[in-house]
A protein has these predicted regions:
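Secreted/periplasmic proteins
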Residues: 2-132
Length: 132
């Protein structure tokens, strides 16, 4: 009976992981440096350092303000740093807009958030991100 229960638990965990992975979007991330205020979403109100500026597609005229995203580095976008990823995942809060044409990524992470998932020397990385 215990073996059957373990199989059910194992299957359930696998299913959750597959569904989580299946809903992840892909894109690129860059980073910006302090000061982080003022921001488009919160003005002069500090929101910490695990924050991000969203590209116009995600920002959606401010609808994404305050939303949280789990971001994982999946690899390099250039040959400068062939293995930039640290293996970590970071959760960030959208506090700002990364406007075109200057925005070079899907999500512009704070320097601290970017550094937790990748080598800053890479400058730009491929990512998977999921709203949490």
């Amino acid at each position: 009976m215990e073996a059957a229960a373990m199989k059910v638990v194992s299957l359930a965990v696998s299913l959750v992981l597959i569904l989580t992975y299946a809903h992840a979007d892909t894109g690129t991330a860059t980073f910006y440096t302090p000061p982080y205020v003022p921001s488009a979403c919160f003005g002069l109100e500090e929101q910490g350092t695990m924050i991000a500026a969203a590209s116009e597609g995600i920002y959606n005229n401010g609808a994404s303000c305050g939303r949280m995203y789990r971001v994982t580095c999946t690899g390099p976008t250039n040959l400068g740093v062939p293995q930039p990823c640290t293996g970590n995942t970071v959760t960030v809060k959208v506090v700002d807009l990364c406007p075109s044409p200057g925005c070079q990524a899907t999500i512009d992470l704070s320097q601290e958030a970017f550094s937790s998932i990748a080598n800053p020397d890479a400058g730009k990385i491929n990512i998977e991100f999921t709203e949490v």
